[in-house]
Amino acid sequence: MKQKPDLSFRKLWDLSFGFFGVQIAYALQSANIARIFATLGADPHSLSYFWILPPLMGILVQPIVGSCSDRTWTRFGRRIPYLFVGAAVAVLVMCLLPNAGSFGMAVSAAMVFGLVTLMFLDTSINMAMQPFKMLVGDMVNEKQKALAYSIQSFLCNAGSLVGYVFPFFFTALGIANTAPSGVVPDSVIWSFYIGAAILILCVIYTTARVKEWTPAEYAEYNGTNSSVEQEEAGKGDWLTLLRHAPATFWKVGLVQFFCWFAFMYMWTYTNGTVAANCWGVDTVSYTHLRAHETELHL
């Protein structure tokens, strides 16, 4: 088995640059979904129900993408086709989701539309996100992996910061941060539009700049035979892999499991909590108002 060559900083950057756009999309989703559904007419105290389907899809999509991409060999690479398709779907859904209240639908229909688009958005973001992590494992040697993941972490946090700031930035530019009842404000809509544009441009950049190894090159650098690898991959599934996972995997997984309790509460209820405690918005009265508007629309 040959040693994987050292990559220049530029090449390590190119491997993960698309992650910047993916994280902008993820930040826009996590920061604004509660606001969008509350605007559409959802009870602010029951917003967590809208978050049930997206994580379920993530449980399925992430291992499926990993398993399928392990067995995929195309002229475009093995990971890049998945991240490009995921990003393309995410861009489409990001243009639709904030407009759920602008299509003239009844409140119930708008919320169902929003729920379905949220499910596809979370699924497509997961599909676009995971291949970037796999590219580092495929193409970076052990000596440079710490640097590669540090670059990825920097781009991840930078993208999150940009995504969180976008609505404030566009409001400061004079784009309306308020809208008629049941309609998402333009500052949020344009945040999703610009985020979608940055996402696809970042992914196109990585797609154009990164050339994945051929099956022969992969086998040469990773000590595997591609035909044997494909044959072995077909003998098991991700459930089998879970049963044989090392103890460290389960320890880290347990910590992550409890961390995500806090993340979901934070993303779902922070907006309403800040509105009630910092700005004095009466969320109970707001709930009754939206319920009355829902009855009128129905």
Question: Residue spans of the language-model regions?
Answer:
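Helix-loop boundary and gating motifs at the non-cytosolic
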Residues: 2-55, 251, 264-280
